[in-house]
Amino acid sequence: MDGHNQNQYQNQNQIQQSQQPPLKKYVTQRRSVDVSSPYINLYYNRRHGLPNLVVEPETSYTIDIMPPNAYRGRDRVINLPSKFTHLSSNKVKHVIPAIQWTPEGRRLVVATYSGEFSLWNASSFTFETLMQAHDSAVTTMKYSHDSDWMISGDADGMIKIWQPNFSMVKEIDAAHTESIRDMAFSSNDSKFVTCSDDNILKIWNFSNGKQERVLSGHHWDVKSCDWHPEMGLIASASKDNLVKLWDPRSGNCISSILKFKHTVLKTRFQPTKGNLLMAISKDKSCRVFDIRYSMKELMCVRDETDYMTLEWHPINESMFTLACYDGSLKHFDLLQNLNEPILTIPYAHDKCITSLSYNPVGHIFATAAKDRTIRFWTRARPIDPNAYDDPTYNNKKINGWFFGINNDINAVREKSEFGAAPPPPATLEPHALPNMNGFINKKPRQEIPGIDSNIKSSTLPGLSI
């Protein structure tokens, strides 16, 4: 009797389920980035001696966009990573203090406070693998110039050396007594420098992992360090409001910059030529110096919020990006405007941005923040209204545009008062400019020392290549 009632109950459930309308499935297409097509176009044009086509502000010109290294002149604005493409996060979310692209640009390495490395694919933005790298929070990591090695540092002061397949080959225990904040390789990868909250910098021999020299002179935590891409010159930034330049051969401080009034958070040499040095501080300022002219200040930009980190563009030597405490991104061009950003993304992240990284090819830009997410940004298609004013990150979520819905391959909305991006003015030279809402600066172009200059870099005494 019980079995008969059970069968009758199951039949009734099946009838009820068959009468219910089927669940509606929302299908979203995952975006992917293919950089091979622009390179095929570039190779074809060079092989047959053809000029590169000028990209006009019209959607059909998308197929004519070249790779980033083809735009080094006035059309360099095309290389701005203004289009939000994808958001990624680990299943178990942690704050992300550092991200770094692999040298070939195919994967993004993400380091977390849990001591893990996770790898994300650069084309489809899919998760690839996860590994436990350190016992404490990974605070920084850096690839060598020859792409054969990677070094990482953690909050316990430990340094680890990795092969490209993430096989650890050496561990330097107690390299510093406090958390390691930054590290950098020398131009020939024979040495690397680290800085820490223990107020000192250390130079290490990469071949044997031995400490060679201690650079002492800062009076508080050393927040950042960088090695000149060509010369024997190290720059460091500290909580004592100073930026110092060091001679790695003697270990002496050769110059100090006293322009800042608060903690200097980050400093970086220009990666292409190394003529310029940029630093940001908690006094809400960003300054660019020319190392060839006694550290002459070329630019000073102030903001209402703190700058947290910075990154130079890998292809265009005059362009760089600043990340702010409120989660916004600001893109600058030294040849366009010295007083304000040429592009601002106000809601790039929900919380403070901790790390930036340009793909070595220059077509993808990755950002990480304390909202525990990684966001990928790419170059915009011509006349795409969402490129510079996307409701995804400008907090104007209209017409149902939000994460997961605007991932269609033809994600171009109708023009409206929110993000209606007009084409460039008729007076502008037709130089392959994509849609720019408030982007064109009509001020006269200003020449900056240190960019496209033939003056040699080795003008500081004792600093030869």
Swiss-Prot record:
Coiled-coil positions are none
Q: Which SUPFAM superfamilies match?
A: WD40 repeat-like (SSF50978)
What name goes with this protein? Answer: Polyadenylation factor subunit 2
Q: Which GO terms describe its cellular component?
A: mRNA cleavage and polyadenylation specificity factor complex; nucleus
Instruction: Summarize the subunit comment.
Output: Component of the cleavage and polyadenylation factor (CPF) complex, which is composed of at least PTI1, SYC1, SSU72, GLC7, MPE1, REF2, PFS2, PTA1, YSH1/BRR5, SWD2, CFT2/YDH1, YTH1, CFT1/YHH1, FIP1 and PAP1. Interacts with YSH1/BRR5, FIP1 and RNA14.
User: Is Nucleus included in the keywords of this UniProt record?
Assistant: yes
User: What are the WD repeat spans here?
Assistant: 133-163, 175-205, 217-247, 259-290, 348-378
Region ranges (Disordered): 1-26, 417-465
Question: Entry's Gene3D superfamilies?
Answer: YVTN repeat-like/Quinoprotein amine dehydrogenase
Q: Which domain of life is it from?
A: Eukaryota
Where along the chain is composition biased (Low complexity)? 1-20
Query: Which InterPro entries would you find in this protein's record?
Result: Pfs2-like, WD40/YVTN_repeat-like_dom_sf, WD40_repeat_dom_sf, WD40_rpt
Role: Integral and essential component of the cleavage and polyadenylation factor (CPF) complex, which plays a key role in polyadenylation-dependent pre-mRNA 3'-end formation and cooperates with cleavage factors including the CFIA complex and NAB4/CFIB. May bridge the CPF and CFIA complexes.
Comment field (misc): Present with 7810 molecules/cell in log phase SD medium.
**CDD domains attached to this UniProt entry:** WD40
Task: From the UniProt record, give one GO term of the biological process aspect.
Answer: mRNA processing
